[in-house]
Amino acid sequence: MKNLNRWLVKLLQAVLRALKRNERVYTPKTQVKDRTALKKPTEVKGVNLLLIRDTFTKESTIGRLYINGESFCDTLENPYINNERNISCIPKGQYKVRLRLARESATRDYLHLLVQDVPNRSYILFHRGNTAKDTSGCILVGNGREQNAVNNSRLAMDLVIKEILNLGGENINLIIKNK
């Protein structure tokens, strides 16, 4: 029980440090027209993430992430290559997601999202990075996009985590679709 309490205290301290670092104003979110993402937290308890992939190149897959029906940020993944580890984006479908504490350095922790139960894959994360070289099969987030890249990844990741924590941080569901 003491170990659990220590872990929870460390987790809360990491969250508070992340929130203090990123008290920045960001632009209002826009509504999504896809009915799948329009479920409000009162209808389905928890957080509903919808990732719609819309740009496909040989180097990357770029999409848009919606949180509880509101457009939130851009995403970048590897192109789909038969769901191969470290070089392919994950298959479209429905997944459970949970918050995961990651140690960035000896003095600094941060949170990222772990996508669970991906067939033949493990440790698929939402995390910071700007190009497909940074992803290794994970999902990168950013505010703004270029060809095969997303921008302002650190700020975008912090805002995603902050929004998920504001919505309760539990029962996180992810739906991935190709446009």
Which positions does each model-derived feature cover?
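Cell wall/extracellular polymer interaction/catalysis modules
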Residues: 2-172, 178-179
